[in-house]
């Protein structure tokens, strides 16, 4: 049997990466163009009002200047496409992955995960097809057991790949809506939304670090042990023994898969994005800075 897609994981990763990159880059430009003019007008008016209040003594001079500087920096990031790309997008799409790669235990680049999964898929499929040819068409029990073992293996590979691929896609999605979210940082009532957005980006960065540490070890271990396990299965005496060996192979992959699937929850707890108290901490920190400025 010839596969329609020789390297399915690499192909799917490339297709989704190109689709989301193209679509979200276009959406980012549209968002920045839409908010640019009204935001600049509103901020200009706000700065004028802030200046009047400072002159009249209704707002502390140091506090007023600090607010104007903060708002100016945020607006520059939102309306300036080059600024947003250089200081926000490049940090989470380039700087963070390069930094995370330095902590690799195996030396296996995280970007090669789809290719590694393709190799595992191709090698196991060859053995599965060989065993399938040994099962008689009337042997329903062996057919059912064989199909179960095959689907379990598919599930473990695809779930691990899904966690890996979701990191890159969700990073692009969060960065694409960034200008809209950062507008909320200007206003006191919506500042917590921007804090949560930053928290989610930090969480994804932590998840990328955990994947680089755990997923690369798991996949490299699976690829190393796979040849030996498939050799034992292939030379088993009976077809039934080979099918049992396939389930033992599934158990091995399920163990590694459980480690990878648990990583998003671990990253979320470390990053604090799942904690209801996270935004309260951000607000409390902001109030402390405000008190220092007034003092």
Swiss-Prot record:
Naturally occurring in which organism (per UniProt): Rhizobium radiobacter (Agrobacterium tumefaciens)
According to UniProt, the name of this protein is Protein VirB6
Provide the protein's localization: Membrane
- Which cellular components does GO assign to this protein? membrane
Task: Tell me the keywords, alphabetical order.
Answer: Crown gall tumor, Membrane, Plasmid, Transmembrane, Transmembrane helix
Identify the gene encoding this protein: virB6
Q: Name one GO biological process term.
A: protein secretion by the type IV secretion system
Span-the-membrane segments of this chain are 35-55, 68-88, 167-187, 201-221, 226-246, 251-271
In the bilayer, the protein is annotated as: Multi-pass membrane protein
Residues folding into a coiled coil are: none
Homology family: Belongs to the TrbL/VirB6 family.
């Amino acid at each position: 049997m010839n596969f329609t897609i020789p390297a399915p994981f690499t192909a799917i990763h490339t297709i989704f990466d190109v689709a989301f990159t193209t679509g979200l880059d276009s959406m980012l430009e549209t968002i920045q163009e839409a908010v640019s003019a009204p935001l600049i007008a509103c901020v200009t008016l706000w700065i004028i009002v802030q200046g009047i209040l400072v002159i009249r003594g209704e707002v502390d001079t140091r506090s007023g200047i600090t607010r104007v500087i903060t708002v100016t920096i945020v607006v520059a990031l939102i309306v300036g496409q080059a600024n947003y790309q250089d200081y926000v997008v490049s940090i989470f799409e380039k700087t963070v992955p390069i930094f995370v790669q330095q902590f690799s235990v195996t030396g296996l680049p995280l970007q090669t995960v789809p290719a590694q999964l393709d190799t595992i898929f191709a090698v196991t499929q060859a053995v599965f097809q060989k065993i399938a040819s040994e099962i008689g068409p009337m042997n329903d029990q062996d057919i059912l057991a064989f199909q179960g073992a095959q689907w379990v293996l598919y599930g473990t590979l695809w779930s691990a790949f899904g966690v890996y691929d979701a990191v890159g896609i969700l990073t692009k999605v969060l960065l694409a809506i960034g200008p809209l979210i950062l507008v909320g940082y200007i206003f006191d009532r919506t500042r917590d939304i921007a804090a949560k957005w930053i928290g989610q980006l930090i969480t994804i960065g932590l998840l990328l670090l955990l994947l680089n540490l755990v997923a690369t070890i798991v996949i490299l271990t699976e690829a190393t042990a796979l040849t030996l396990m498939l050799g034992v299965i292939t030379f088993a005496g009976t077809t039934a023994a080979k099918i049992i060996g396939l389930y033992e192979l599934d158990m091995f992959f399920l163990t590694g898969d459980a480690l990878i699937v648990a990583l998003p929850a671990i990253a979320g707890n470390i990053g604090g994005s799942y904690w209801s108290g996270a935004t309260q901490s951000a607000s409390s920190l902001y109030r402390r800075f405000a008190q220092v400025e007034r003092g």
